[in-house]
Amino acid sequence: MLEAKDVNFAYLRGQPVINDMDCRIEDGEFVALLGHNGSGKTTLSRLFMALCHPRSGEVLVDGEDIIKREPADLADKIGYVFQNPDLQILEDTVFDEVAYGPRAKKLTEETIKRQVLEALDAMGLTELQKEYPRLLSFGQKRRLGVAAALALNPRTLILDEITNGQDALEKENMMSYLKAINEKRGITIILISHDMDIVRRYAKRAVVLHHGRKVFDGTPKEL
């Protein structure tokens, strides 16, 4: 469970970007964060990952102040996929890209192989595991980023504009895989998006931000 309680935040001496934020996300939810550029969506997700800390209020993970949690513990629980897939891609094979995180944790080779193959299968990339990422389509690179996060067995995935720049088929592929891991594996999905059609068809809940404030919290149908 992730929760922001009466959170306020501003970058350095700038204008506040999160104002009086109360937002609770339960385990296993599929939630979309909506809002125009600068509305606070990405900042809220960064607060949930302890990449920045509130000026006032609390951010909680499983009821505990996130500031008290060890970074490695948070990294195990929350995976983040950047808007630009090239930020997460090195020059190894697809398999090695996904194995990077588990290897950094010094897991056994047997465990690494199992977790990587499960992640590749979950995102429809098994047949591409020996390819090089630079040869993949943009949509495949995006799925590779998700697979790399999945290989660490997170409880929550935060996905920043995960369908941006993809054609209709790539969007459907991406969202069908995300729906499956949410429903079959119980992984919480937090989808940062501008795409109302995607949100309407896949998210179970929508949270709308405007100038750093929550202005709507309900089902996409209600929105």
What does each of the following model-derived ranges do?
Residues 132-136:
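Conserved ABC ATPase signature
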Residues 57-65, 74:
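Conserved ABC transporter NBD signature motif
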Residues 110-128:
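Conserved ABC ATPase "signature" region
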Residues 34-36:
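The feature captures the beta-strand-to-loop junction immediately N-terminal to the Walker
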Residues 49:
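Helix-to-loop junction immediately C-terminal to a conserved catalytic motif
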Residues 193-194:
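H-loop/switch region of ABC-family ATPase nucleotide-binding domains
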